[in-house]
Amino acid sequence: MQSHSGNETTPLSQRLTLLLLTENQPDFLRRALKYYSSYPCNVIVVDASPAPDAQVAERAGLQYIHNAALSETGLSARIAEGLKQVSTPFVVYAQVDSFLLPDALTEAVSFLESNERYGTCQGYSLGYQAYVDHVDYFRRDRKVHEDYASDQADERLLSFMGQSVSLLNAVTRTGLARQWFTSVPEGTERHWQEIGHMAFLVAAAALRILPIPYALHVNAGKEAEHRYGAAIAGAVKHIDPKAKAERETLARLVVSSLGNSRDLQGEQGEHAVLAGLAAMAECLETQPYQGGEKIISSAWNVALTQADAQFEPRQFVELPFYNQPLFDELAQIEFLIHLLPAGQVQMEGLESVLVKQAELLRVQSNPDAESLLSRLWQAYAHYSFSHSVVQRLADELGKSEDEDDIERAERIVAWGQRLQSDSAFDNSQLLRGMPSGKLLDWLDARDPAPAQLKKLTTQLTRRPAGSQIGILLLDLDADVFKLQATFDSLINSHYRAFKVVVFTTGGLPATTSLNDTLHFVKVTESNYVDKINQVVKQASSDWLMLAQAGEEFTRSGLLLASAELIDAGQCRAVAVDEIHRQANGTLAPLFRPGFNLDLLQSVPTLAARHWLIRRELLVEAGGYSREFPKALEFDLLLRLIEQGGMSGLAHLSEPVLIC
């Protein structure tokens, strides 16, 4: 290779332009701009979102192109739009959810500057998927022949296309990039754009794959990756007339885009391109277009404030990913990923942990609740990238005179400073814009104002008859933590007239009676239904609700329900609304309609739980049936309907539980 490099003193911003492509990805865009902020190349953002991003448009040192019409176009048209503004000799393009490694870009530029015969250069890439607490990495590229330097374009085509390597994110001479992307007809399918791009670049000039880590590209998921890989493979492998015609069309496009190439012209050139596609088809007979095997899972170690990589059993050591400089770079990327979250998968996980943090840090009225410091440590362990959590933990530790706490406070303060240096935004505020956060804000807004709260409390004190609510709390797993969560929610609520009977398989913490606000009854799996029915007969509460340990009561739900029950003499049973804690930890409302027998029978797990049952009617109905231990409430409601029809079955539009 001949070296003609003379650009060592020319600023990188005059040598390389990075085109960042985005559409409705503001979080990814901000993260990408932060990642590349210290890399001194020229940056152009091409934004196809419906509305421009004013904050990004005003950033210094950045060219921002907003064109909403590009949303109706393909990849090539978007890149072509950005290329209009490129004045550097080299260009590279990436989606905003990718990370092109700066050192690799610089090395690729240096290689092309030193070797004029080469038009394109890149290294090897990984796939990644970010979660709230870890990042998974996937093999994407395979080890391939790395130098395609033949003087004959047809030889380069045959050799490179037989390797099936994407070049969409390679550093390319700007002239070649314009030559291709301005030639691609609108409406060309994405997979044909990628295949054509590969064929054009290797036909136009020599090509180099450097043995270095080059980029991270977000993993689209197994199904999406499989569909796209199948489209690529089908395009070059299928033998039906339509597929054959599409290949011939692409061959003509590649040859025409090359212009006056002396190597590939006319039918001879088209045959060379088709031969390259055939070589690609042969390659894809035995392997997928891109790999998808998970090779590393890197969890963020809260204690050490760094990434902790765990390797999968199968590795690909022939690839250049096993070196300390790369892992140092990945650690910096992971820090950014967690500090500036983006993408559906990560944001869904973040919503869950932010809900948990909000619950841990709410004001506690229960003197037996966990200490604030203990709850702050738990919140920090769930997600250590919330400024407010870090600050509150540091403040609380700072109050201690214990030497260990003082040392911990210093570490937490240093961590907070590191967060602040890269982003001043408090990620805990993201909850306000998420479904769970909006639901929690809505619940808070339903709290009675102080004057109304005083009025309701006075009203219930003066007219207690007929409105007192008792909770039958099942603790069949003897889980003290779940019990504590339920107790905390009751004590934090505005309702004070409740009585709770806990039916537990665990040891009794104290000797209590039904006259106490909190009464414990020892039960077994075989007799708890009978024990419940005994308590129902003796209880003094007017209304009873069956609940499970761990379910939490909203702050004002029981109070507002009790106030409604004062004048509900005609009601036999009342359904209430609920907030459901979903499997992923997020919250969703369950707003029940008025009583509907069809709904009750079709989805009893949703429609039959947490009814307020008038105690004397529960006794008259014979209590709960031990024949249906998994459907106690559903069976009871059906018997109440058999005895008295559907009259007196009501619904209260008030969320009473989070369950």
What is each residue range found by the language model?
Residues L126-D133, L168, S183, A204-P241, ...:
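Active-site donor/metal-binding and catalytic loop motifs
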Residues L105-F138, S556-L587:
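Conserved donor NDP-sugar-binding/catalytic core segment of glycosyltransferases
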Residues K34-N42, D488-A497:
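Short, acidic, metal-binding catalytic loop of nucleotide-sugar glycosyltransferases
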Residues R140-G162, T586-R609:
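Short, flexible, basic/aromatic active-site loop/helix in glycosyltransferases
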Residues L176-W180, G187-P211, L617, E627-G648, ...:
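A short, conserved alpha-helix in the catalytic core of glycosyltransferases
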Residues A69-Q85, V523-A539:
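Glycine-rich, basic loop-to-helix element that forms the pyrophosphate-binding segment
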Residues V91, L544:
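Short aromatic/hydrophobic "clamp" motif used to bind/position activated sugar donors
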Residues M1-S13, E282, Q287-I469, L474-F481, ...:
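Non-catalytic membrane-proximal stalk/linker segments that position and tether the catalytic domains
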